[in-house]
Amino acid sequence: RRPMPPIDPDTLGEQYGMFLMLFGIQPKNDGVHLCGCPLYHTAVLNFSTYSLHMGHTVVIMGKWDPEEHLRLSEKYKVTHSHLVPTQFHRLLALPDETRSRYDLSSYSQMIHGAAPCPNDTKRKMLEWWGPCVWEYYAASEGGGTVIPPSEWHDKPGSVGRPWPISQIRILDDEQQPCAPNDVGTVYIKMGDIEFEDHGDKGTTEKAWNDGFYTVGD
């Protein structure tokens, strides 16, 4: 059994909430998080539990449906949610009459990640939801980037800058740094974090380079 961390639970809860501050989400503040993805995924679980640590209400959908997401958003005056691009596509596919039926003005953060989001899809979501659509790039192993809607308008397609204590390198096939605009493999470093793939030390070693790891992107 993994030992409990040697830290007071109240202190740990406050630290957990700091992650949401990367997206401008603040403690208390009548926050309401709508969970529309499976809680077994690290990101989904983190956004939900960290919201609880910040004193927010969390609304959990038993099964995600695009119109039901809109209905619950209006009913509970949801302030932030976390979705993936496929769900954006399904929301945008709703008839205009359905989309205009619900008040989404309570939202301050609609956060998305987990997969590439086409620029056209992102623009349409920003036109519909307003300047609340935040994007991040990350991995369950730790570390990543974030970009607010204001910066995305200037650099469409970007996933932003590294989080605090997170570093990013783009390396070529020879494990050398790529020049700007060159295609390479993403390597991430998050503080002093270390891990090993279960039962596969060889794969783990291939994923690491000078303290940075890659998931193959």
Q: Which residues fall in each region the model found?
A:
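Short beta->alpha linker loops
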Residues: 64-65, 86, 116
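Gly/Ser/Thr-rich phosphate-binding loop
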Residues: 53-56, 78-83, 92-155, 167, ...
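Hydrophobic alpha-helical segments, especially N-terminal targeting/anchoring helices
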Residues: 171-172, 215
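Adenylate-forming
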Residues: 2-3, 14-23, 33, 70-72, ...
